[in-house]
Amino acid sequence: MKTTQELKELLYKNKTVADQQPDAIAEANAFCEGYKAFLNAAKTEREAAAYSEQLLKQAGYKPFVPGMALNAGDKVYLINRSKCVLAATIGERSMAEGFHLNIAHIDSPRLDLRPVPLFEKDGLAYFRTHYYGGIRKYQWPTIPLALHGVVCREDGTTVTITIGENDEDPAFTITDLLPHLGREQNQKKLPDAITAENLNVVLGSLPIADADAENRIKLSILGLLNEMYGITERDFVTAEIEIVPAFKARDVGLDRSMIGAYGHDDRVDAYPALMAEIEVQHPAHTTVCILTDKEEVGSDGVTGMNSMYAYHFLQQLCAATGVDSIAAFQASKCLSADVTAAYDPSFSEAFEPDNGTYAGRGVAIYKYTGAGGKSSTSDANAELVSYLTRLMNKNGVVWQIGEMGRLDLGGGGTIAKYVANRDIDTIDIGVPVLAMHSPFEVVSKADVYMAYRTFRAFCADAE
């Protein structure tokens, strides 16, 4: 019979990064300075793609051209419609032995402008918005907001708009009802207290001088936009303007162990995946990092992972080296990098503690996602889970495994199933997030760093 101590050694232990690798904390802090810069510069998918392209160019990546000659060690990249990033390092082995894919998304929940957004009502001018992704509407009023986007003007030129990020810029906001008049609102269920039609962004209150004109405040705002950017009301029809929180990424906690920011979902996985791809040199397998769009709304469309753009890129890589893409896909492995919920002690009733993932305990694996009875998920094979855990153990990565929360409370999906549907072995992995999908999400720096070390080990692995 084994002793008590010997039996305890059989248990699954889920210790913090600080307990297991105290020296890694300083490394995590240093790594996350670059991540915070990425967050502040990349609040939209277009900005994330542009920032990533700068990093790739600085690292010596060349634009990919179908049919170009590719040799081991070459680094190539492609930008899809200004919203997706595809970067590859050609491996020493044939692509017939498979790719190592790190895939994350760079869109985040937000508010978009409607096609005809500008209106005036009772002394104020507003933008009407259409929420994008799974937001909790009550979280968006009474915080500073910024405008980011592009406008394709009627003359064919394109102008970029960013207002609200610099200290000298004006901010924007959405109002809420004062508590003194909130008795009826307080009786409503939480999702109904603030509706989609309440999410109107305040733009201004000064009218033009002509007292006889209609919509004097709307005209005043439109005149300012025309002076600043040369746009008309018609140009909003051909614009993509996003309303995002104006917060900067900030250290959270007296110990500065966490980061609070907008857009951790999923840039907290995208940045480490990209950095691992950039840093790999002469890998055994061809490595590919894909940062995709539209995950928050189902991954459809020409920039979503459910389209063919990413797989066409992989097929073109295969064609350039004379490899059958079907064989390459079947031999490939993919880490689908997306966030999961961090166990929140303030809302412990929503979680199952033994299967929760915790801030500060390392990068999280989740064998499956989905809702209820594992609907709409890619359930990774045990062999793939074993491969990944052995890889992380070999490379000193602190990791944990779990589920999002209590069953039948809800659920969530990732892009893993779209990759797996192309006959590529895929598993979900990511950083646990507190207050996910809120305007100010919180993550542990140690977990971000362990995600990076996982992606780095995966890029370099020869198995």
Role assignments for model-derived ranges:
Residues 1-463:
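N-terminal hydrophobic/helix-forming segments and targeting peptides
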